[in-house]
Amino acid sequence: MADARRAPLKDQTDISGARALIVEARFYDDLQDALLDGAVAELKAAGLTHDVITVPGALEIPAAVAIAVDAAAANGKPYDAVIALGCVIRGDTIHFEIVSQESSRALMDLAVSRKLPLGNGILTVNTEAQAWARARASELNKGGDAARAALAMLRIKRRLARA
């Protein structure tokens, strides 16, 4: 279901044939399947190919992004966009705050320093019910949102590179 508060972006710069990387934290398998399905559907609809790398948890996502982006570029097959997917559910300790803040900060640092179109789909929620509402494509579809964010940034990057 589309979020009525969010107007669709009008930039239709061609990005078909681009290559995306999805890095997912498989801490909650079933939730992750829903996030991944939403992201993959958006990439396919836009005509992108993609690779998926799985890491143990959200804190490992930024390092995996950096490693994969560097390796792909060195092999002459750079990634054009990156989508980070995972879920952090609040517990009784400060672990939630550390994981949420540090993974987001590191992803933003990567996106800015490398001019990397990146969509952050790491859910940070209080309950598993909140996570499911955000993960399901039939509800808030945050996996799809993260992919759309990365695609929007890729369109901007391509359009401005041609200007």
UniProtKB/Swiss-Prot annotation:
Gene giving rise to this polypeptide: ribH1
Lineage of source species: Bacteria, Pseudomonadati, Pseudomonadota, Alphaproteobacteria, Hyphomicrobiales
CDD domains: Lumazine_synthase-I (cd09209)
Keywords: Riboflavin biosynthesis, Transferase
Protein name as annotated: 6,7-dimethyl-8-ribityllumazine synthase 1
Pfam families: DMRL_synthase
Gene Ontology cellular component list: cytoplasm; cytosol; riboflavin synthase complex
Chain's role: Catalyzes the formation of 6,7-dimethyl-8-ribityllumazine by condensation of 5-amino-6-(D-ribitylamino)uracil with 3,4-dihydroxy-2-butanone 4-phosphate. This is the penultimate step in the biosynthesis of riboflavin.
Binding site for (2S)-2-hydroxy-3-oxobutyl phosphate: 92-93, 134
Organism: Bradyrhizobium diazoefficiens (strain JCM 10833 / BCRC 13528 / IAM 13628 / NBRC 14792 / USDA 110)
